Amino acid sequence: IADWILGTHLVFEPQNHIRFEEDVRKELQISPIDLHIHSNFSDDGYYDVEDLFAQAQKAGIRTISITDHNCARANTIARRMSALYDIRYIPGIEIDCMYQERRVRVLGYYIDEKNELFNSVESESLKREKRASLERARKLKEHTGMVVDMEKLLENNRFQMVTGQEIARVIFSNEVYRQFPIVQKYLKDEDEEKAISRFAEDLFGQGGPCHVEMRYPALEDILEIVHLAEGIAVLSSWNCDHFGEAFISSLIARGFDGIEVFSPLVSGETMARVVKIAKGEKLF
């Protein structure tokens, strides 16, 4: 994908019958790039847009893309920062969706971030997260009798997301609830941080009594949005360690233009499988 984006390729001088003092094979320099960055417009991002450009400049990265979760807002700021820091910028986004009852993510590159469709993507994401947060609290009350003030937790919550871990922390900070048997059984055997994590996993994790199943837009709808916004759709490597080759091939057939291969979050074995698919399908 780097060669395609930058238009670079390796060049070797032909081995003619000409005598040189030394081997003069040359190759064009390929600039470092990072096309999967999250800013603080994502719930898992820490840095604002300018901080990311400053860090990229310091690291010698020449091309970046900020692909926030279900949000295209960073791109407008990033375009201004691009000129200021002399770093090439490719507008991007990463959108959650569903395919065959499994959650996948679509990376959109070269998008027109001003397209109104992305406002809808973000709005629906915030509504979805708020509904899920309230449902977690409702199930907790039903299962344990413990009540969490969700209005307070959501009041200044930028992403309208209150996780099971955050709810567990509120419960463990309440002196009355700490005396409940369901909380005591976690406190008596472990230190507090481990107790909170295990409580959250047991109650809100997959199969737990307070677990909330999330539903996302259909993959086909998200691919259409990216293409209508003049972008290219790339399958994110997120969770690909758990996707079989047949499933990935089926995904690609729905209309992807490319696939993310290299990521520190996936195994070498997965990268090898994905490279094979990308070459076979002639993907970016």
Indicate where each model-derived feature is located.
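Alpha-helix capping at helix-to-loop junctions
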Residues: 114, 142-146, 177
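Secondary-structure boundary/capping signal
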Residues: 86-89, 148, 179
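An N-terminal domain-start capping segment
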Residues: 1-8, 137-152, 192-200
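An N-terminally biased module of ancient metal coordination in phosphate/nucleic-acid-related enzymes
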Residues: 1-102, 203-282
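Active-site phosphate-binding/coordination module
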Residues: 77, 94-130
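Alpha-helical scaffold segments that flank or form the walls of functional sites
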Residues: 50-64, 80, 116-122, 126-141
